[in-house]
């Protein structure tokens, strides 16, 4: 089984890769690859979308990457297991208000809002 960590130029790839390699090796769960190759992403058994930075810039990077359509195909059309990490998780929401209002993938009904430090 293959776990594909999606590289769209906006993620904590190294730490995610090392963590998944350790988990898959110790549990005999297949292999892990960091990739932006649509063919590999669309055929992977599991998908991971990391993210590091601001929601608007991560969304723009993802939408302009070759990986986007393959990710949607694998996660939505093929219903493969999908994990978002950090901003990768936030991108699944309906929208975000970080810096500016930005539409998300709308896979999860919800909005990402800044937490007031006073709370």
Task: Please report, for each region that a protein language model flagged, where it lies by residue.
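Short, conserved catalytic or interaction motifs in soluble domains
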Residues: 94-97
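N-terminal beta1-alpha1 cap of cysteine-dependent amidohydrolase-like domains
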Residues: 1-81, 87, 100, 106-118
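Glycine-rich nucleophile elbow surrounding the catalytic serine of serine-hydrolase chemistry
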Residues: 86, 90-92
């Amino acid at each position: 089984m293959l776990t594909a960590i999606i590289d769209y130029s906006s993620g904590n790839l190294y730490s995610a890769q090392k963590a998944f390699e350790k988990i898959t090796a110790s549990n005999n769960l297949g292999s892990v690859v960091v990739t932006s190759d649509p063919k590999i992403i669309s055929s992977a058994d599991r998908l991971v979308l990391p993210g590091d930075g601001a929601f608007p810039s991560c969304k723009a990077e993802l939408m302009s990457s070759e990986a986007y359509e393959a990710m949607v195909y694998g996660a939505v059309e093929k219903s493969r297991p999908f994990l978002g990490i950090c901003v990768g998780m936030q991108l699944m929401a309906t929208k975000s208000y970080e810096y500016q209002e930005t539409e998300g993938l709308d896979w999860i009904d919800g909005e990402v809002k800044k937490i007031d430090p006073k709370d």
